[in-house]
Design a protein with these regions (language model features):
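Conserved beta-strand-loop-alpha-helix hinge in the C-terminal portion
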Residues: 203, 211-226
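ABC family nucleotide-binding domain
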Residues: 1-200, 204-207
Length: 226
């Protein structure tokens, strides 16, 4: 997979020959310095942008063949997102925020029950009916993780999920994601600038100058969830 921005002399190669597979239940870190291409890679995996060349497969589907409407629907059903800031709607309850991605499809009693179960799993049983502006930053990020899981996605993509938290709260969020990966068999792809914060994980991919490395070895790597 390659991504080039611009043309001719102003062209910037943001990603160069990147291709890798992801196993179900794997917790994968993508690390790199600012401008390395890691955010561009996350946008490709998250189907928020299209590669200049190459393909992105998810659950056996070549997503580069989908039109914009198909891609949007596929993204909502197959991917969950967690960002540096929780981005909860302050006038909604924690439960209502968790249900937002599901509302794009349809919210029914089953969805509400699933959301409540997820909130219990992430430790927010007592806060689920609180307004989002009445909970702490760490609790908000837990709610964001539950929101990312509500559609039972193949992959949860997390972009600097601990970047706005103090060290103690960040450690709680790290352990929560690790626990969910094991307990639910949930695949996580996490972009971070600090791989040491996450300790032992299944795999670490380093992005440098748009190229992907596992350890010291450059990898020409298909993005799949199987």
């Amino acid at each position: 997979m390659n991504k080039v921005y611009g043309e001719g002399e102003t062209a910037v190669n943001a990603l160069r020959d990147v291709s890798f597979s992801v196993k179900k239940g794997e917790l994968l870190l993508i690390v790199g310095s600012s401008g390395s291409g890691k955010s561009t890679l996350l946008n490709m995996i998250g189907l928020l942008d299209r590669p200049t060349s190459g393909k992105v497969f998810l659950d056996g589907v070549d997503t580069t063949m989908l039109n914009d409407n198909e891609l949007s629907s596929f993204r909502n059903s197959k991917l969950g997102f967690v960002f540096q800031f929780a981005n909860l709607l302050s006038d909604l309850t924690v439960l209502e925020n968790t249900l937002l991605p599901r509302k794009i499809q349809r919210t029914d009693k089953t969805a509400v029950d699933e959301a409540k179960k997820l909130l219990r799993t992430v430790g927010l049983e007592k806060q689920m009916n609180n307004r989002a502006n009445k909970i702490s930053g760490g609790q908000a990020q837990r709610a964001a993780i539950a929101r990312g899981l509500i559609n039972s996605p193949s992959i949860v993509l997390a972009d600097e999920p601990t970047g706005n938290l103090d060290s103690v709260t960040a450690e709680i969020i790290v352990q929560l994601m690790k626990s969910l990966a094991k307990k639910l068999g949930q695949t996580f792809i996490i972009v971070t600038h600090d791989k040491h914060q996450f300790g032992e994980v299944d795999r670490v991919i380093t992005i440098k100058d748009g190229r992907a490395f596992v350890g010291e070895e450059q990898r020409g790597m298909e993005v799949t969830a199987s």
